[in-house]
Amino acid sequence: MGHVDGMCMFKQKTWLLLRHGNKLAILRTMGQKTGAHAQGKYLMHTAFAMRPGTSHPQLGSWAQYFLGRRSRSMPDSVLIGAGNPGPGFFPPDHAPFPIGDASKGIRDLLPKIDRKVFNHRVQLAQRFSRVFEKYFPHDEVKAYAQFYDETLKFFDSKTVDAFDINKEAPKARSLYGTSKFGRGLLLARRLLEHKVRYIEVTLGGWDGMHNGMNAGEQRTGELDAPFAAFLGDLDQRGLLKETMVVLTTEFGRTPKINQRGGRDHFPGAFSAVLAGGGVNGGQVIGQTDEKGIKRAKGDKISPQDLHTTIAHALGLPVDERIHGSGGRPFFVGNQGSVIKQVFA
């Protein structure tokens, strides 16, 4: 791969990922202001601060809004190993499709009652829906009814096989390993082949405020092999050039170890990794000081900048204003700046 200045940030636990260093652009000066998990995750997922009474969409929903759905037989966005944040202020069909465990695929796919009874209940529900639409002819009501009907068709189609990683060859399953995260990445690759536009795979358990050194090394080891396998697999199949891969977190960890042998929340400086999708790999963007506390080189990169950069790579109009619920104006990326060096 050749030497890349700054790749020393990778520890021995990520030696497999280091082999793909020429594909990676590492953002060293990510930063934000909140050190609370819920608020930090929300900000990193949406580029907006959490506000009572307002729900903001994630990037997959933004992409569907601007570019339309790629397929009526598959969801446009899938979240693996995470909850379901909903569509934000977009219609219901813009919500991501949640998969709790990739090994189990789509749970409760088949009705646990006789099929005739199930179909009869669906028909009754549709009758009630049509009556409701008649008396409340709102766009939101129609969108929900359409979303419900499309979901039923999806569950009854052969496209659901894309969610079954057991259909993969043993060699492919072995490549990704048996961890929940590895299986999630394998499912992500299958979904990319079926034209799903936006996929998120979650690896939790990084909250190492107690005995954080051991926990951090363990989690890093769990990340390394599956993520390296994912990048290599996408590259071999010709998918990496058209797929931007993003590895990030809600905030960093203090360089200083606390009295409990762990690291506390540190939103001021952390890193993100980008690959594929037009990214110019083999570079490190920005630099913190020798203690990892303050930015020493390059611009501070905000969650808004990261979102805007991804949106730009997707071809979304980052300068176009739209109006959400209540007529409030919004921009994808919340008016961040494109990190041009990522593509240079």
Regions found by a protein language model. Give the residues of each.
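Ligand-binding pockets and gating/stacking loops
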Residues: M1-A344
